[in-house]
Amino acid sequence: MLVVKKGEGVKVRVRVNGVWYEKYVSPRTLLVDFIRDELGLTGTKVGCDTTTCGACTVIMNGKSVKSCTVLAAQADGAEITTIEGLSSDSKLHPIQEAFKDNFALQCGFCTAGMIMQTYFFLKEHPNPTEEEVRDGIHGNICRCTGYQNIVKAVLDASKRLRS
């Protein structure tokens, strides 16, 4: 069990988007706040703070997690990928391209979490049906699009990733 005296921070060492970071933070610091405030990676959004909306979705040790209910200290030693880590050489990831090309975003608030959930989902289901896509993104909420274009984008992304 980790014992921390009042006013002391805990050391958190994580690999985010391929880069190791080591910071001292309050034991109560949430992973989403660590990513945004300590690392300056603001693509990951804070929506509900209750794991309901999925805007804070990141990949941690190969699994999709909602970073608003994970303590930064729990992520110590973890490998994390955020939306900023998907693209390379200033080029969009195929999932990002599919979302753009299929008009799968409007206000954009949910987009980073939706794309990260899609990334995880397509690793597990590279050739999904529409029904599987709808089930695979069910924990991520979009108030703007009605999901039709998001589902089309996920199906399109699966084709792009397979070719």
Swiss-Prot record:
Q: How is the cofactor bound?
A: Binds 2 [2Fe-2S] cluster per subunit.
Which Pfam families does this entry report, sorted A to Z?
Fer2, Fer2_2
Catalytic class of the enzyme: oxidoreductase
Cellular location of this protein? Cytoplasm
Q: Which cofactor does it need?
A: [2Fe-2S] cluster
Q: Which residues form a coiled coil?
A: none
Q: How does it assemble?
A: Heterotrimer composed of a large chain (CutA), a medium chain (CutB) and a small chain (CutC).
Q: What is this protein identified as? A: Glyceraldehyde dehydrogenase small chain
Organism from which the protein derives: Sulfolobus acidocaldarius (strain ATCC 33909 / DSM 639 / JCM 8929 / NBRC 15157 / NCIMB 11770)
